[in-house]
Amino acid sequence: MVRALHEAGFEVIMDVVYNHTCESGPEGPTICWRGLDNLSYYRRTKDKISRLYDTTGCGNTLDFTNTHVTTFAVDSLRYWAKRIGIDGFRFDLAATLARLDGEFTRYHPFLYALRSDILLGNLKMIMEPWDCGPNGWRTGEFGIPFAEWNDRFRDCTRKFWLTDVDRTRSGEYGEMTMQDMATRLCGSSDLFATDPDRGSTASVNYVACHDGFTTADLTMYKSKHNEANGENNHDGTNDNHSVNFGHEGPSSDQIIVQQRQRATMNLLGTLLLSLGTPMLLAGDEFGNSQNGNNNAYTQDNDITWLDWDWLYSTEQTPELKQFNLTSRLITLRKSHDLYSHEDFFTRLSKIGLLKKSDRVHWYLPNGQMPDDSDWTNPAVRSFAMQLLSPDE
């Protein structure tokens, strides 16, 4: 499969989960490292060695302060890269892999092993920069050569186009300012300008992923609907920043349908025209829905299956329309050298200083450039960004 994808021009990034095993908590089955060396492979609380220390939400956490655990993970990665030809890896709950004495550090031996390995250090390595433990959100802190999922981009984009619009319609100010949105559009330097040579491509921008709502569901459901998961709708996050445009779920009202379609393309347009590395959830290109389920990992049925029947329709279906628009956005992005570099086009540096870039211009609807007060004024909802190539 990997060889076939390579022949078709695709790189293959593999999602790997080294933070826990499938044995769950103390009462779980013995089917992995627990049966070999329970005390060495799993993290324990300091006050009671028999108690597992869990930063994954899965009942157990592998102990990456143990040299054998680090060696096991590195050997596994090298096998997939060298023998199978994997081009890179996405590390699930990566903050767990970099905890020493319970605290995250970018200088963790495991991260050092990845950086210094002659094979792995030249591959694409993407971190999910958080876990369920204390101080677990570490977005932007992994450093070179790692890319990281940018949850700030996700939340800012959702709020700006969805919940902030709802608030302004009821006479309130939104949460996101022009400065907030501009920073995300320009590569999130406040998070990723952490090293002299670290660029905007370290920011993996996304609006939706396998966890949470699909992009279409962000515009159809104000609340999660996880009843099919069998946990009385208690599972899954309630922090979705989603709207329903006046009706929960699918609607035949064409005004609502058009509002949702426009909002969806606003989200995808922002994703695909921002500096950084865009990540698109499979199915978002044609408006796939999970019926409001935002924790669908347990569902192997039509809730999560992608329906491609629209491809064979002779009509201009909503799916085909969105697919074509998304394809045009991708083509537009690939046709400009603006997105093939790592510069940050921003006013805000990591240390909070304002710096100008001669490759980005900002305009208000009246054609004037914004002044300093406009950047933090929540009433400023409309602005234009002009990016210039190096030759202009």
Regions found by a protein language model. Give the residues of each.
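Carbohydrate-binding surface patches
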Residues: 362-392
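Acidic, His- and aromatic-enriched active-site or binding-groove loops in soluble protein domains
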Residues: 32-46, 146-160, 301-308
